[in-house]
Amino acid sequence: METKQFKAESKRLLDLMINSIYTHKEIFLRELISNSSDAIDKIYYKTLTDDSLKFERDNYYIRVVSDKENRILKIADTGIGMTKEELENNLGVIAKSGSLQFKKENEVKEGYDIIGQFGVGFYSAFLVSDDVTVISKAFGSNEAYKWNSKGAEGYTIEPCEKETYGTEIILKIKDNTEEENYDEFLEEYTLKSIIKKYSDFIRYPIKMDLTKTKPKEDNKEEFEEYKEEETINSMVPIWRKNKNELKAEDYENFYAEKHYGFDKPIKYIHTSVDGVVSYNAILFIPETTPYDFYTKEYEKGLELYSSGVLIMNKCGDLLPDYFGFVKGIVDSEDLSLNISREILQHDRQLKLIAKNIKTKIKNELESLLKKERDKYEKFYESFGRQLKYGVYSDFGSNKDILQDLLMFYSSKEKKMVTLAEYVSRMPEDQKYIYYAVGESNERIEKLPQIEGVLDKGYEVLYFTDDIDEFAIKMLMSYKEKEFKSVSSGDLGIEGEEKENTSNSDDKENKELFESMKDMLSGKVKDVRASKRLKNHPVCLANEGELSIEMEKVLNAMPNNQNIKADKVLEININHDVFKSLKEAYEGDKEKLKLYTDLLYNQALLIEGLAINDPVEFTNNICKIMK
């Protein structure tokens, strides 16, 4: 019997494939089962084109048999089988695809597809076996042949006996090594788990004889083992069922079975698309944040199937980061696969699916916001932060997609509102969308800077997330209304008369303010009369793009560079404290220095900033109490 050489590449290529392409050895079973499914598909196709043939589904199945004692694993099918020439052409050439050739030779009709890439996928058998035998009898032939190979050195083909058409793959499982436990691929539980994981939705039954126990007939207290045939796979995935046949409970059960979360989904999306690219998808929006969601360990992505065969557990390319909380599956027959499903080529079809999914999620969230506000607010409590990161990231390129999904707490409504709702009720004379930043709504309400805006009757949005102001700086405006912090130097709300009065106050007290600025030794950019304060004596305002709150966030990051916002100390000249300042300036410069330091540190504390010298601050308080 002649040993033939592989026609494609030498041992180096086969070694490269085994060691590099396949990252998980268990996928060998997925590949071989997929090839068996292809073989049955070909029989089905023949029945579509030959009226003399009848496809009786019960006669077509895949069987997996484990023989632990002899270290043999068999995968058999009742598919179309292979002739001697097909064995040589399909198995003698690495990466030769019999399924692909079959597609080329036959017009593929609607509803019919072949998932396999025969060749490299088949050779994944060598991941777990160093002796692979294929026994096959082609449909309509009286002859059967046995193909055998022990690795890259070559293969043999010889006639053999086989009663029925179909193919049987016999793997001699490798012995264990220090690095690998090959015994597991002979265990019923492991084989069943691999089938459920990768091949649960193959449309033909995958059968195994499973070990069961039952009480002995002569002694009910003792048990004996017996074998019982079971179909392991579900065959019909939920996403291929008619949506009208499914209930919310069915989706919730699927969510739980897939271990997407311990909660119930707040929203599920079942979509089927036919067009340039065709796919089925079920997407879930969770109710609560996964415990690791905001950690580097969290991995976004959807399960990706090709015709019911799992390709990737988490395909991150299907979701933008800002929708990374979405769970679910996508199944398509249009994906381009590079080298037997293990490496997915990020091609045009995948990008089209990702684009469609992004739009679908956005539309569903907008619908949830409009029709089920309570549910949306619950979702936003968990994942609003992620949407705001989406606005900020990638230089704001996604802001138009996400801006209508944002919500903030409102000073007027005392609840969460959208930007559209805020703008819709702005008075005609209001130029800006005003916001205030703080650690909590309660602290923001007590900010001195907010008094002037509220006194004008304007609504203020409360920013309590550290990402909020960064996102809004990237957004810049909404419906042609710019955003303005209540701590900004110019609020844009004063009338001409008040503007002139304020400028007059600065001129009148110029020397006092310059003296206070000098006493603060560069800690503030300026000291001036406040246009915004009503009841408080002092506050800090900021000049420029970097706000005081942004300074706090940036300096809290690892390896901070001690970034400082340009601060302005604003004095309420209508407050009694200002009279004390004027008296000290005119008669006691040392007391003026004491008052200036106290007011500056008071303003820092109101902003939640650390004071430079707490001991000096408390000593100064004691001085004025004497």
UniProtKB/Swiss-Prot annotation:
Gene3D superfamilies: 3.30.230.80, 3.40.50.11260, Heat shock protein 90, C-terminal domain, Histidine kinase-like ATPase, C-terminal domain. Keywords: ATP-binding, Chaperone, Cytoplasm, Nucleotide-binding, Stress response. Residues 498-509 have a biased composition (Basic and acidic residues). The keyword Nucleotide-binding applies. Residues 1-341 are annotated as: A. It comes from the Bacteria. The keyword Nucleotide-binding applies. InterPro entries: HATPase_C_sf (IPR036890), Heat_shock_protein_90_CS (IPR019805), HSP90_C (IPR037196), Hsp90_fam (IPR001404), Hsp90_N (IPR020575), Ribosomal_Su5_D2-typ_SF (IPR020568). Belongs to the heat shock protein 90 family. This is Chaperone protein HtpG. It comes from Clostridium botulinum (strain Hall / ATCC 3502 / NCTC 13319 / Type A).
